[in-house]
Amino acid sequence: MSDAVPTESIQLQVLDSVLYGAAKAFDYLGIRGQDMLDKVGEGILDYCIKRGFIKRADDPQQFAHEIITFFKNNGYVRDVEVTQDGEILTITMRGWNFIPLMSKLRNQNCFLLSCPLWMANNSFMNANSLGWKRINERVTADGAYVEQVKFVPPAAATRLPPEPDDMSTVKAESNVGKRIGLPAFEATEYGLARAFDYLGAQAQLLLDSVGSGAVEFLQSELHVQLPKNRRESLQELSSVYTQGGLADKIDLNLSDSKLEVAFANYRYAPVLERLLDEGYRLTSCPFTLAARAVLRNAGFAATEMQWRVLNDRNAEMRMELRVAGQEFDEDKIGRIMDGV
């Protein structure tokens, strides 16, 4: 239930790397890319309900409260306050750990919200035929995010206020070293894998683009230095994600034809197991996405990935390699989005 405080956590930078990658991957669609990210929210809510992390409620206000409480208890936001004056709602978020990432994206002219809380909320709003017209936003001197909105029909909803806040002036505290509850990590990772299934053959290629963004994030935020040698680069990624708490140990066996990885006490294992049980072929493991990007930069691409989930959150992955070629087709994804 949403009032349960998790006993296990993972470093936020592990999740931030793929949230940054996801926003960057859809940036070329402009604000329509938010529709893609909101599909991640569908998976987040589905996972939370199936796992009993939140309780489904017929009352929209109660369900929204469940979502907020879940992310508060998982350490993603300290407090969310909503006040109303006539038609106008003022939402104040304190200790919101998306602000550093939002500032980084805004400074690159990317206005997509890959925040798990917002993606889940947007999905909930869409499912209930609700929309928000965003009026204004600001970040206060003490780091709180304040936004004013009003409810409108979905067709009149807006993704941004008329004048988005200038995040270049925000001195946001870095998320490096901060932690998030494991349930929130699992739910978001599940949503990322689930969201793109309808894209068919383009889906894995798009997730590979997310992996490229994850590598960019690690290099810029954690100052990770990746050697030109692909084996050494993969070892460095293994070290970074192990230190972040993705697994206690990540062992690699690399050749020109395959990559084999063994994960010990793998925090992604519950997500992986559920995806495989439900018949999904896509996975969103941060290490695997980043590793695929490193291999692609070295001229290799994966033709097939095989997973085995063992006991005690241990797992094994085998990735067949070939000479890289195809990239994801932006125009094709745009056409698919026209039908969403």
Regions found by a protein language model. Name each.
Residues M1-C115, A120-A127, G131-P286, N297, ...:
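N-terminal accessory segment detector
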